[in-house]
């Protein structure tokens, strides 16, 4: 095995296009680094994290910043996501988080997740980013009748322990506002998110 990732990830000269790249036009030009240059800070990587790091260093610290990207800006994971802004960004439950890290650290984690979601919305607004923000919350569906009680409990924890705005919808209520399929048995909505 030569590489641990699919060979497409190493094709910087001919990156595989994502849905987002195929449905929008590029509105900036990139130049190759062909000579020695200097700056106070060099940020390596032009994904979301690298771009926001560069912006913050320039705007908040007035630093001279150069951003280097081996491929195209936004190429990789940043342009290959579902486009949702939701939290928490993990698959394990809040109960398991509390068991592993304790209640205080879990509260901090959720607080940071809420702040991150709000920060993302602020970035979109402050820079007039045309990204078709839709909605103001996220939903967790009960995919089986016995899961409805779990999401009801989760809503109470979100509200009472983490201070997160959360609402519960019965199957019939959720039918009226969003999803009439037979595979849902109620839902939890929480804010912020989009």
Question: What does each model-identified segment do?
Answer:
Residues 52-56:
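Short amphipathic alpha-helical face segments that pack within enzyme cores
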Residues 34, 74-78, 177-180:
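Short glycine-biased active-site loop of nucleotidyltransferases that positions the nucleotide triphosphate
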Residues 2-16, 22-23, 91-98, 122, ...:
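Flavin (FAD/FMN) cofactor-binding and adjacent substrate-gating region
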Residues 80-112:
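Glycine-rich active-site loop/strand segments that organize a redox cofactor
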Residues 1-41, 59-63:
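Extreme N-terminal leader/targeting segments of oxidoreductases
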Residues 108-122, 153:
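A non-catalytic, amphipathic alpha-helix used as a structural packing/dimerization or gating element
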Residues 45-49, 70:
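Glycine-rich Rossmann-fold phosphate-binding loop(s) that bind the pyrophosphate
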Residues 58-80:
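Glycine-rich FAD pyrophosphate-binding loop
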């Amino acid at each position: 095995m030569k590489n641990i990732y699919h060979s497409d990830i190493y094709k910087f000269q001919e990156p595989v296009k994502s849905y987002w790249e195929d449905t929008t036009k590029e509105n900036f030009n990139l130049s190759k680094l062909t000579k020695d240059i200097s700056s106070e800070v060099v940020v390596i990587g032009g994904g979301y994290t690298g771009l926001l790091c560069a912006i913050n260093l320039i705007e908040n610290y007035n630093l001279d910043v150069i951003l280097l990207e081996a491929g195209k800006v936004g190429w990789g994971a940043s342009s290959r996501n579902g486009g949702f802004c939701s939290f928490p960004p993990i698959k394990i439950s809040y109960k398991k988080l509390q068991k592993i890290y304790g209640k205080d650290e879990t509260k901090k984690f959720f607080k940071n997740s809420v702040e991150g979601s709000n920060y993302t919305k602020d970035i979109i607004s402050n820079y007039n980013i045309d990204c078709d923000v839709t909605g103001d919350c996220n939903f967790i569906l009960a995919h089986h009748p016995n899961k409805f009680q779990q999401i009801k409990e989760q809503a109470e924890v979100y509200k009472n322990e983490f201070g997160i705005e959360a609402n519960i919808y019965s199957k019939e209520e959720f039918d009226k506002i969003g999803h009439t399929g037979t595979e849902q048995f109620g839902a939890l909505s929480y804010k912020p998110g989009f």
